[in-house]
Swiss-Prot record:
Keyword Iron: yes
Pathway as given in its UniProt record: Porphyrin-containing compound metabolism; chlorophyll biosynthesis (light-independent)
GO cellular component terms listed in the entry, alphabetical order: cyanelle
Signal peptide: none
Annotated gene: chlN
Catalytic activity: chlorophyllide a + oxidized 2[4Fe-4S]-[ferredoxin] + 2 ADP + 2 phosphate = protochlorophyllide a + reduced 2[4Fe-4S]-[ferredoxin] + 2 ATP + 2 H2O
Cofactor: [4Fe-4S] cluster
Protein name (record): Light-independent protochlorophyllide reductase subunit N
Keywords linked to the UniProt accession: 4Fe-4S, ATP-binding, Chlorophyll biosynthesis, Cyanelle, Iron, Iron-sulfur, Metal-binding, Nucleotide-binding, Oxidoreductase, Photosynthesis, Plastid
Length: 460
């Protein structure tokens, strides 16, 4: 058995398979976030069954996504992929007329080497609708990384010039060529007066209520957001210039961050993620430090949140929680729960990008030191069989796991919580810390209720 280090985090990597949801499930929240989009998932019947069951949307609701089901003729190359996709996209254009069509590649398109990147530009020119290709296959990516691949593909579609300024300059240059330079300088001076800080683009798909909350928190520190990726409408993608600052709000967007740095020459703000009051405060403080702003009011804001959690903290204090690894939110949630008084012996995580999560890892270490608890063992790509043996040895009070392992663990008398619930719950910002603890304590309270009824044989 591996010993837990009390001072620094210990990282290990096993050779286990991904025990997660398929990454094409990102369609579930992205098609609702980008309201003028249409997602076309290109896969097999299995992909279709998964989407239909996981999303729970009936066909008569006409959702803005669909399945392009591959048949034997596609796999044996007897059917022309371009003509079939052209037929489907033309039908989508006539029926829904979206601003963008997103091709979602699956495991099957990877295996048969379907050239979606080669087909998309030709098809886009022919039907007149932008087509973005995202490979969200379960061979290479985990559950939430599907969003990462979509956002990484959208980066190249973000404009490098402000649309209104470009339109004004174009009209001025055509009507009054001699005034074009003067107009450009005037616009630049006005922009510099309106924006005291450098442009800041936040990336990560969150409900509109959460984006408004985070924007409001930054506006209190006199920091204005220049854009979000993704946006409510495809035509409103943020303007990204070389040298702009970017900051992520979710731990699973490493590919998006890399593309912003390498392709658009942006400067990444490495900050902890705004999950829990401690993470949200650290996130704001890091952004303020980049813009040389002294943050104000954060002590009172964080204290008020912790005071509001007084009813939950006694339920979790001293309890142990084990993370089996599913949605890449494990480090952030574990850090918050340790701050609440819980003990985390092990964190399983399907994939860990240490550079992108560097600040989160540092905050996790500091939190363990502050709470005077052992640092957890972090295992990347955990082997499921070995993981279950360690759970039997630890006997934690709660295991946060994927749906596949929940019932077997419950049968062994171990409390579980589905990790997918944290993916779809609103857990970001100061005001949503209560929702995290509500999810965590629900299983603990349920066991207490059953024991009070005298049904101990069901849980022991």
């Amino acid at each position: 058995m591996n010993q837990i280090n009390n001072s620094t985090l210990t990282f290990q990597c096993e050779t286990g398979n991904y025990h997660t949801f398929c990454p094409i499930s990102c369609v579930a929240w992205l098609y609702q976030k980008i309201e003028d989009s249409f997602f076309l998932v290109i896969g097999t019947k299995t992909c279709g069954y998964f989407l239909q069951n996981s999303m729970g949307v009936m066909i008569f609701a006409e959702p803005r996504y669909a399945m392009a089901e591959l048949e034997e003729g596609d796999i044996s190359a007897q059917i022309n992929d371009y003509e079939e996709l052209k037929r489907l996209c033309t039908q989508i254009k006539n029926d829904r007329n979206p601003s963008v069509i997103v091709f979602i590649g699956t495991c099957t398109t990877e295996i048969i080497k379907m050239d979606l990147e080669g087909i998309a530009p030709k098809l886009e020119a022919e039907i007149g609708i932008p087509i973005v290709v995202a490979r969200a296959n379960g061979l290479d990516y985990t559950f939430t990384q599907g969003e990462d691949t979509v956002l990484a593909s959208l980066i190249q579609r973000c404009p490098s010039k402000d649309r209104e300024t470009e339109k004004i300059n174009k009209n001025n240059s055509s009507l009054f060529p001699s005034l074009s330079i003067f107009s450009k300088n005037k616009n630049e001076s006005n922009l510099s007066q309106d924006k005291p800080n450098l442009p800041l683009v936040l990336f990560g798909s969150l409900p509109n209520s959460l984006t408004n909350q985070l924007e409001h928190e930054l506006e209190k520190q006199n920091i204005k957001i220049s854009g979000w990726l993704p946006t409510k409408n495809y035509k409103e993608l943020p303007v990204i210039h070389e040298g702009d600052y970017v900051c992520g709000v979710n731990p699973y967007l490493a590919r998006t961050a890399t593309n912003l740095i390498r392709r658009r020459k942006c400067k990444l703000i490495s900050a902890p993620f705004p999950i829990g009051p401690d993470g949200t405060r650290a996130w704001i403080e890091k952004i303020c430090s980049i813009f040389n702003i002294e943050p104000t009011g954060l002590d009172e804001r964080e204290k008020a949140v912790w005071d509001s959690l007084e009813n939950y903290l006694p339920l979790v204090k001293g309890k142990s929680v084990f993370f089996m690894g599913d949605n890449l939110l494990e480090l952030s949630i574990a850090r918050f729960l340790i701050r609440c008084g819980m003990i985390v012996p092990e964190i399983g995580i399907p994939y860990l990008h240490k550079r992108y999560q560097e600040a989160e890892i540092k905050l996790l270490e500091d939190t363990c030191r502050k709470m005077q608890v052992p640092t957890p063992l972090i295992i990347e790509k955990p082997d499921n069989y070995e993981e279950l043996k360690r759970i039997e040895q630890y006997r934690p009070d709660l295991v946060i796991t994927g749906m596949a392992n929940a019932n077997p663990l419950e049968a062994r008398g171990i409390n579980t919580k589905w990790s997918v619930e944290f993916t779809f719950a609103q857990i970001h910002g100061f005001s949503n810390a209560r929702d995290i603890l509500e999810l965590v304590t629900r299983s603990l309270r349920r066991k207490n209720y059953i024991q009070q009824l005298g049904w101990k044989e069901l849980v022991e």
